[in-house]
Regions:
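Alpha-helical interface subdomain recognition
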Residues: 1-89, 101-106, 113-118, 143-147, ...
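Long, acidic (Asp/Glu-rich), low-complexity accessory segments flanking structured domains
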Residues: 216-233
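Flexible, small-/acidic-enriched active-site or ligand-binding loops
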Residues: 136, 189-220
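Short Gly/Pro-enriched turn/cap motifs at secondary-structure boundaries
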Residues: 114, 129-132, 156-159, 173-175, ...
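A short, Trp-centered hydrophobic/proline-enriched beta-strand micro-motif
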Residues: 117-125
Length: 412
């Protein structure tokens, strides 16, 4: 097994790191304090290809592999976790579903703009009464001639208010349950679309989360993404890839916290020596680094499987997201402890990292949902099992998932 990176992968990692250190780190505390959206910084990252990492060059993207993508996200999250999630959403749950399910006209209209970073995308599944239970959404889409009229409310929309295209999920056939949900490409200029409010969040404050109001929002029939009733398939396939991105985000935050803690331990003195000379601090740092490396391996393995054309990545991305999101919360807690009172101050980077990390166990599937996905796959594999050492996994039988839309069913 080769754990080395190609020259292109190292170049992407190093270029993004240099940009983040020079352009983003100097302003992150101020932007976090003010809750200022990182529009200029995201535009520059888009010009570098970070908004369309996985999009083929023919559509304006970088045409990079998933390993390069997670390396990019880790470097961004190491300094600004909120910026990383804005990029993850545009890449994983907007561009990829559009690339797979979009018509030729939809691809031409939206994909190059997304890939070049000229606009961001937003994924609109969650509603006030429907989080983990996606089939419980209440937003309706009713056809009137050549348009659909959407009515409902979408909540916790990352990039909401800043995106140029929204994938909105609505019920076209309420009687069909999970098979009655369809996906639509919605522009903020469409009649009936309104950003109702922005959330005042504990963390990820430089990435805005909005509530959307849809009142007879008119969406042309040609803006339906995929077939009627296939909306949750579109959503879950996107989330399979998105969870790899969130795993990378967790690794990046944790790496930033580790570096800050190690530097502090080498300069902070107590009882006549640096605190890094005490075994208690050394063991905390050692545990932090070990957990980060374990999470990094899970994330990069899931990314490698995706690049290898594996028939299913859902359980792998769920494991990566589960472990990384819980790992980073343990790591940032240790980082605050190592910093002592300084770690409780807004002047400390680890204070922000502590707040930013908390949501990772919630969005793009809670830890509890990840465990359900993992266990369902494990218990349903009654024939052939995935080779845990890296061979291409064989898709589980139907019993592995009672909702087929939760399984990854194809490549890009």
């Amino acid at each position: 097994m080769d754990f080395s990176f190609s020259d292109d992968q190292r170049l992407i990692r190093d270029t993004v790191r240099e940009f983040m250190e020079a352009e983003v780190r100097p302003t992150i505390r101020e932007r976090d304090r003010e809750g200022k959206f990182s529009a200029d910084e995201l535009r520059k990252l888009g010009e570098m290809g970070c908004c369309g990492m996985l999009v083929p060059e023919e559509w304006g993207g970088a045409g990079a592999d998933t390993i390069s993508y997670v390396l990019m996200l880790e470097e961004v999250a190491r300094i600004d976790a909120a910026m990383a999630v804005a990029l993850s959403v545009t890449n994983s749950v907007i561009a990829m579903p559009l690339l797979k399910h979009g018509s030729e006209s939809q691809l031409k209209k939206y994909l190059p703009r997304l890939a070049r970073g000229e606009t961001l995308g937003a994924f609109c599944l969650t509603e006030p009464q429907a989080g983990s239970d996606a089939s419980a959404i209440a937003t309706r889409a009713v056809r009137h001639g050549s348009v659909y009229r959407l009515n409902g409310t979408k909540s916790w929309v990352t990039n909401g208010g800043h995106a140029g295209v929204y994938i909105i999920f609505a019920k076209t056939d309420p009687a069909a349950g999970s098979k009655g949900v369809s996906a639509f490409l919605v522009e903020p200029s469409f009649p009936g679309f309104r950003v109702a409010r922005f959330e005042d969040k504990m963390g990820l404050r430089t990435s805005h989360s909005a509530e959307l109001s849809l009142v007879d929002c008119e969406v042309p029939e040609e803006n339906r993404l995929g077939d009627e009733g296939h909306g949750l398939r579109v959503a879950f396939e996107g989330l399979d890839g998105g969870r790899i991105g969130i795993g990378a985000q967790g690794v990046g935050i944790a790496q930033g916290a580790l570096e800050a803690s190690a530097a502090y331990a080498k300069q902070r003195r107590a009882f006549g020596k640096t605190i890094g000379e005490f075994q208690a601090i050394q063991w905390m740092l050692a545990d932090m680094q070990t957990e980060i490396e374990a999470a990094r391996c899970l994330v990069q393995h899931a990314a490698w499987l995706r690049d290898s054309g594996a028939r299913t990545i859902g359980p792998h991305s769920a494991r990566a997201k589960l472990y990384s999101s819980e790992m980073v919360n343990r790591v940032v807690a240790k980082a605050v402890q190592i910093h002592g009172s300084q770690g409780f101050s807004r002047e400390s980077d680890v204070e922000r990292m502590y707040r930013d990390a908390r949501v990772l166990t919630t969005y793009e599937g809670t830890s509890e949902i990840q465990r359900m996905v993992i266990a369902r796959d494990l218990l349903g594999q009654t024939r052939e099992r995935a080779d845990s050492r890296g061979a291409e996994p064989v898709a589980a039988g139907a019993a592995a998932s009672p909702r087929a839309g939760e399984r990854f069913t194809g490549g890009r």
